[in-house]
Amino acid sequence: MSMTRVLLVTLLTASSAFAQETNDPFPEPISSTDGVIRVNFTEFASVPDIDGQPARMMLLSDEPGTRRLFVNDMRGPLYSIDYDGRAVTQYLDIDGSDWGVSVQSSRNELGFQSFAFHPEFNRPGADGFGKFYTWTDSRNTAPDPDFTPGGGGDTHDTVLLEWTARDPSAATYDGDGPRELLRVEQPFGNHNGGQIGFNPTASSGDSDFGLL
């Protein structure tokens, strides 16, 4: 008990001394009548839970060709959202049994990392018509990876997939299975990919237009 009393006395003494030395440069309240910034929010859309767990959203992206927003859940689903936010539709579940992707999302950092729509996604006859890309962690570690960093073990792979929709404006994905473009071996369980995308400032005819 004596030690507690000593500490309390010391703290009180120090606090008192500190308070006496303080020189408040603004003794009067600063008026906030001009230039006040107010922050409000309105719920725009709600992405569904999975098995009672809230969606693990990673990226929200605009696809102006079909006038929709898209957002992914790291566990596999890709949702489309109307511009007014009223309709949220599952466009594709890349973890679905039809695709054989086997999304690895058992930990917070793992899962369906990112996606990108080709800038010509909704241009009939163009090379990028109907094409979009997903970048995801997968439990499948076959075929052999294109890149092996070394060190650690082969805990999972991160895979870049190309999907091709027959009708880009369809409510749900109507194409065949994806084409694998790149597979990277990950040596540790908390390693994964980052965001993928196209150069938003590139125009048709530029050297980097349509390059992921």
Regions inferred by a protein language model and the residue ranges of each:
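Basic/polar N-terminal segments that are highly enriched at the extreme N-terminus
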Residues: 1, 18-20
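Compositionally biased, intrinsically disordered low-complexity segments
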Residues: 9-12, 84
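Acidic, Gly/Ser/Thr-rich repeat motifs that build Ca2+-stabilized beta-propeller blades
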Residues: 20-212
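Sec-dependent signal peptide recognition
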Residues: 2-9
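N-terminal signal peptide c-region/cleavage motif recognized by signal peptidases
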Residues: 14-16
